[in-house]
Amino acid sequence: VFKERTVGKTPVGTPTGTWVQWQPSGDFFTHTEVEIAKIKDLFKTITALCPGLTIVLSDNGTITTYYSEHGLNDLVDEAVKNKEVIANRFNMNFAEGKNKLDMVITYTSNYSLNLIPYVNTGLTEKGPHITQIKTILTREFNKFFREKKWLKEKDENLTGDDIQEGMYIVFNITAPNIAYDAQVKSTVTKIDMTPF
């Protein structure tokens, strides 16, 4: 462990970053074997959620570099690689203050909705953010369809089921003051979606 110290400005073109070495200790863990496949999947996901970030994994002399040029689109590519894609992708990036939403949507010939929700780069399973994203999408699709006159004044609005059939959505919300139900952070209990 080192004391904090000032190192000055890094010359332009000099690589920067953080180096972490980790080996599980039997003093603290009952299972000390590293599941490298899970770590590789995690690094692939993190670099897609943080485009421009490079992670270099050194595993017993084998070096693997993770970098995502296309961000969430790389996660969507992985999710739909064995599916029949029937629509162009819609990419959305929104930022206001400390709140940010990145989302990619596409459609496949499947009948169900496939939603992959991240909050502050952590995969989540449940929470009000999922319901609110579905509500926002339904509202915005109906608004768009009415502007294009694809829905006439007498027509009823499309339902969430109409819009979400075959939809693949990957999104990451970055926001402060999020509450979770447990340390695992799979269920969000409080999130302010007002900016979105």
Which role does the model predict for each range below?
Residues C50-V56, D77-F94, F141-G160:
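Active-site phosphate-binding and catalytic loops of NTP-dependent enzymes
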Residues K98-F196:
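GHKL/Bergerat-fold ATPase module
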Residues T16-V20, T45, P51-I55, N88-M92, ...:
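Structural beta-strand/beta-sheet cores of well-ordered domains, especially the beta-sheet scaffolds
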Residues L57-G61, F94-E96, Y107:
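Short acidic, glycine-rich loop/turn motifs
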Residues S25, E69-L72, K83, A87-R89, ...:
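Intrinsically disordered, low-complexity regions
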Residues G17-S25, C50-S58, E84-I86, N110-N120, ...:
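Short acidic (Asp/Glu) and glycine-rich catalytic loops that position anionic groups and cofactors
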Residues V1-A79:
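GHKL-type ATPase core
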Residues I36, I46-T47, K83, I130-I136:
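Duplex nucleic acid-engaging cores and interfaces of nucleic-acid transaction enzymes
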